[in-house]
Amino acid sequence: MQKVFDAIFEEINFKFPNYCVFNKSDSGLKIESAKGFLRVCYNNNAQLLRAGLIVKANGLDLEYTIEEQPRFDNLCFMVDCSRNSVKNVESVKKLIRNLAMLGYNSLMLYTEDVYEVKNEKLFGYLRGKYTIDELKDLDSYAVSLGIELIPCIQTLAHLNQLSRYSNRYIPFDCSDILLVNNDRTHQLIENIFSTLRECFTTNRIHIGMDEAGMLGRGRYLAINGYKDRVTILKEHLSRVCEIAEKYDFEPIIWSDMFRNEFNCDKYKNKDGKVEIPKEVIDSIPKNLSLCYWDYHGLTKEYFYDGLEMHKQYKNPVWFAGGTAMANRGILPHLQYSFKIAESAITAALEFGVKNLIETMWGDNGGECSVFAVLPALAHYSYTALGCSSERLKKEFYALTGHNFDDFIRLDYPQTFCGKYTDDIANPAKYGLYNDVFTGYLDPILNANDKKYFIQACEELKKCKEGQYFYLFKTAYALSDLLYYKYGLGIEIRKAYKEKNNEELRGCLKNLDYCIRKLEILIRLYRKQWLIENKPHGFEIQEIRLGGLLERLKGCKLRLKDYLNGKIDKIDELDECLIADAVGRVKPNNRCDEYSYMSIASVNSFDGYTYIDV
């Protein structure tokens, strides 16, 4: 118990009083408090940590009784460590403490190639991978605090970082998909399971296998001829599950390859419901769990068809929802995440799902801080536990030292100060990267919307200092930059077309502000990254933001030359912009999360890997 007490003190500076009585229980958590009396009944160490948070939040010497009965067998958080932001060991330990105090009982580290594998020297090469010793240390720490640390890997697709190497190392079918029915592939998976068995206490392992739509369409097709995807998938899945069983692992997969294959008219009955062929259901390995993932529904009914389909399987079912982070950039989208969580958890309860995962994907660079989404993690767990919003806010403050509503202000640059929370847009990212001369997005943006960023600055100023104050400083720096940059391309083009040199001189001054404020953002964001992550991967952010910095400097020089008569035109500004060219437009002239990639020129904001087939 001492390790638990030490963890509580380290995270929230709280010690149970000497008169506290601790009783082990076979059920949930129960805390009874009165003047000079405190009793904690708990089932495991994670509940004991949670008790520490609850008592700190509600006080000593006050009369109250709090009981919690978990409504789910597994309440898990999955954090993406594969998109450059490999969380450092201390950050993972801090996350483990936070999860236990918030009511979670398991953690998945999503690692495509960022972990050491014996006899695979290129696995995680130069990527900041977790070493075997680091994984052992994290597993031991998690177990001591009652958190199950579950490996979450890939054994079919999403291995594009390995596909850059010669096929003599690892054979690929096409794109990021391994060549299945291949001895070298089987040896790789054997080495993976052998290594992970040495590192982890748990018998659970998530083996991925999602989004492999081109399975069997590349080198596999050339070697074996045509087979339908489901047949190939079942053969590979059977082989991987055999290897998993050899090492006493119980695998879980993302189920979309099955879900997408059968979610079509061919397999629907007269009522429009999908009926999965019995031979498919019977062919799925018995030691396998299926994880239905869906990150977008704002009503519980949205999830019904997917959950109904999964009831047909004989295998255990997990459900994975998500914080709205993927592709969003440096800042979270918390209020949208709250709405998804409420609808998804309600649907999962109605369908009797017993295992929940809250995911935080880091697509396109892992830019958002894992601790910036603590409100979403807390809201998810408290919704799953059936706790009140009053308790959520009180206990969140006890955990972080920050008001829950202050944390929500991190949303403001993304939602125009809370004006839009019912859908996903990404102004803090596309506004950052939209070019000031070739502003592909300018035709559908409103330059006056820059006012929301100065409002966001004013709101972020209200946030008090604390252990996560560095997150607010980064968000402030980004908002401060966007106030000057968001509509700058529109203003430059308008003044240029009107030959209004006085206005152009004002734009030149704003370009200079942008340069200085971007330099501040880079400095603060670098500090934030190194607090939480291994340094590997930040070179991508330095290249992106550094490239943006040089682009702004270049535009400033050319605009200055134009105003000084050294050049008689700016070619990019002479070209007319076409609104119809902009895709993925949201209402009120906003764009979705992918639009930042759409500058006019071929670019490297989102990378592609080519391999021989």
Question: Predicted regions: what is each one?
Answer:
Residues 1-27, 33, 47, 97, ...:
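Substrate-binding groove of N-acetylhexosamine-processing glycoside hydrolases
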Residues 2, 35-246, 252, 318-321, ...:
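Feature activates predominantly on carbohydrate-active enzymes
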